[in-house]
């Protein structure tokens, strides 16, 4: 009877927590056309702070407001580091067509030809690219967010989060001619484990970054993101 009473008190405490303060890190190992973004092969790391506050809840279900800021936001974009033709063209080139510049960040890091050169005899030779990566640093804020948690009186809880914010970078993202200010939204499921006044949450999110056609070009970036959050829970 005494143990049941202790468990009941602990369950009510988990369901009754009002707010939390946390630190998080996320990693997107790749990007592709998942839903609406086109830019490929981006890697993004973030780290920051999260705040959440209960909006509504009972022993079974809970709705929280959540907001976050990521002072560390690093994106690695595929970049042309060299180009080469399939055969030697020394002294034979009469014109060059549609080759990317060395150091240019590209939307698609393709194994297909990136251009061609015309030879004096009228034939053409296709040119391929060698890719490296370029780092761009940014600040991300997501002031509008919500998280639904199931089994809110239990230690292990399924969650679903959705966040909306912006990214402010030191140069255009993901390529030149886009924009240095981009909109950001993400959503996806997760699992949260609560132990006393602490919690750990692991999520897998779909995230999209876009300038909403405010730049000359808007390829957009779609990523699958792993996010890990460590939180301190408070009842006031």
Outline where the language-model segments fall.
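Flexible, surface-exposed loop regions and adjacent strand-edge segments
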Residues: 37-43, 78-91, 176-182, 217-223
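Transmembrane beta-strands of outer-membrane beta-barrel pores
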Residues: 25-31, 69-77, 164-172, 206-210, ...
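Gram-negative (and chloroplast) outer-membrane scaffold detector with strong preference
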Residues: 42-171
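Extracellular loop and loop/strand-boundary signature of outer-membrane beta-barrel proteins
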Residues: 33-38, 128-133, 171-177, 211-218
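Outer-membrane beta-barrel "beta-signal"
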Residues: 193, 220-236
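Residues that define the transmembrane beta-barrel architecture of outer-membrane proteins
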Residues: 17, 41-47, 135-142, 156, ...
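Transmembrane beta-strands of outer-membrane beta-barrel proteins
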Residues: 19-23, 61-69, 158-164, 183-187, ...
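Short loop/turn motifs that connect adjacent beta-strands in outer-membrane beta-barrel proteins
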Residues: 8-19, 54-65, 151-158, 194-200, ...
